Design a protein with these regions (language model features):
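Amphipathic alpha-helical repeat scaffolds
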Residues: 35, 122-128, 237-242
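Active-site/ligand-binding-proximal alpha/beta "capping" segment
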Residues: 186-235, 240
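Glycine/small-residue-rich loop that forms an oxyanion/phosphate-binding "nest" at active or ligand-binding sites
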Residues: 68-97
Length: 258
């Protein structure tokens, strides 16, 4: 098979638009995962790709060949190394990407543990929270309007595959969240003296974590139990990714380790 050389190729053009344009991802309901690790994590969940784009050199890479073997050959597009470098967003790594359909889930009544991201923007923090939530067994994630898109290529890379194991509901208005989430809300706050270690976290919890600068919105604070994380050295606040991870693991400790 001769590799594609033109950036005007429809498959290449579409993938590049998905990588760079939120409106294209929103309109098509698709996104792009880049690199061997993410593609492997995606396939390991039993999920199906729409298209794979791989550079000519990478198509013979020992980590890539087993992955390509799991994919219908009609879905594989080989392009020249120089063309791949024009469209990729990763600066290094093995040159392979896949176009995938963004999963669509219906938000029903939530009675178990869940994570609510309220206006978070930093992809690093979001990735940390998704990975940690998945690690402790939280499987449902809800975002409010104005939260970063969890299926953007940057968030996908930061999540390192956690997205594929989670049920994600994005851009859900506050009133719908209050109507659907029956689990008690807990929110980190600097305006309470009751630290997390004095709370009973044995029962299902809906963790609310807010914007990096503004914190959790007043709509949630009015409905949630506020908890504090002890900071004896007087730091003003913790990184939200770190704060959320501490909460999740204290919950896990109480439930499984007494």
């Amino acid at each position: 098979m001769n590799p594609i050389t033109s950036p005007a190729n429809p498959t290449v053009k579409h993938a590049h638009a998905l990588l760079t344009q939120h409106r294209t991802r929103k309109k098509s309901g698709q996104t792009v995962i880049e690199g061997v690790h993410l593609l492997d994590a995606y396939l390991n969940q039993g999920l199906t790709v729409t298209t794979v784009i791989v550079s000519q050199t990478a198509s013979e890479h020992p980590e890539v060949m087993p992955l390509l073997g799991q994919i219908d050959t009609t879905k594989i597009t080989i392009i020249t190394d120089s063309l791949y470098k024009q469209i990729r967003s990763l600066g290094d790594g093995v040159d392979i990407m896949a176009v995938i359909d963004i999963p669509k889930h219906h938000l029903g009544q939530i009675t178990g543990d869940c994570l609510i991201l309220d206006g978070l923007q930093d992809t690093g923090n979001i990735g940390t929270l998704l990975r940690t939530a998945s690690a402790v067994g939280i499987t449902t994630v809800i975002t409010t309007p104005n939260t970063a898109h969890l299926w953007s290529p940057k968030c996908l890379r930061a999540g390192m595959g956690a997205n594929f194991a989670l049920q994600i509901f994005e851009q859900i208005p506050h009133d719908e969240i209050f109507a659907k989430v029956k689990t008690p809300l807990y929110a980190t706050s600097s305006h309470t003296d009751k630290v997390i270690y004095h709370h009973n976290l044995q029962n299902p919890i809906a963790w609310v974590l807010g914007h990096e600068g503004q914190g959790v919105s007043q709509q949630f604070l009015a409905q949630a139990t506020a908890i504090a994380l002890p900071q004896p050295n007087g730091q003003e606040s913790l990184n939200v990714g770190v704060a959320g991870s501490i909460c999740f693991y204290e919950m896990l400790r109480q439930r499984q380790y007494g």
